[in-house]
Structures are given as structure tokens and as C-alpha cells.
């Protein structure tokens, strides 16, 4: 069966459904990498700027959307900045298991389904639950790459179902200057 559109799962309804030991057939998390670029702390000390993609509304982001956004940002940064000139981290993990009560809509389907009887649904995917102000992507870089980082995060935001903003800061322990772009 095809994947349902994101609008079916964007809003949070009910408690999180995360206990894998009780869920038979829960899908695996299909995000292979959460840290990209320069991952060693010693090499990251040379980066003086920080960019964050921050979500503005409460909701759920499916793992397919997170992976599409990650690939979009990673490919753009690898091509235009180079893997040795940035650090990118995906901060959220899709722990919540989505359920789907599959309904068939074809001739003879009434013999195959139960309607709303036993309508709890079977596992159909995973999603990350996010709150306003939560960081989705975190990037460290040098000041000369600020335009490419902003473009990569903008492209990643286009794959997400919730409104986001890009926050750019200087990387120091005291907070520093903050620049926000919607």
C-alpha cells in the first residue's frame, strides 16, 4: 500500500506509542546517519559559527521527511562547502510508532476488512514528536560558508511538514550574537 500523505500524521493525537517490546512489527528507524561532515571535537573547534533549524509549531515529523531533509542538506553541503568544512547533526529521533487502520476501497473489499471493528491499527511508520523551539538540525561552520549553510537548511526545511526558522549564532560559551531568519 502507498504511504499516506503527511497531513494524516502531522498533528499529535494521544500519548506517544514507543515501547518496541510490546509492538510486534514496528518498523526500523531508516535514518542511517545523524552526524555528518567533521565529527571529531578537536577538528570542530575551528568552527566559529552555529546554525540551527528550529521548529515553530508542535507536531510530528515522519521518518521519511527527516531522511529527505537530511539528504537534501547533506548533498548540498558536500557539493558546495566540502565535507571537511562543516558539521551537521540531525537532533531528533523518530521514536513514536505510527499506526494505520487500512481500509480497502475496491470491489469485494467488504469481504476482506472489518470496518471499525478492532480499529487500533497496525504499525505503519515512525515519527519524531517535536515542540515549539526544538532544534531539528544543528550545524557548525566557518563564517565564509554562511550563505551555503543557510541555503542547505532552507532546502531541508522545505521537506518538513511544520513551519521552521533558521537561527545563526556565533559559537562561544556566553551566547553571543543571534541572527534569525524565517
From Swiss-Prot:
CDD domains: Ribosomal_L16_L10e. GO terms for molecular function: structural constituent of ribosome. It holds the Pfam family Ribosomal_L16. GO terms for biological process: translation. PROSITE patterns: RIBOSOMAL_L10E (PS01257). Keywords: Ribonucleoprotein, Ribosomal protein. It comes from the Archaea. One of its GO terms (cellular component) is ribosome. Belongs to the universal ribosomal protein uL16 family. This is Large ribosomal subunit protein uL16. It comes from Pyrobaculum islandicum (strain DSM 4184 / JCM 9189 / GEO3).
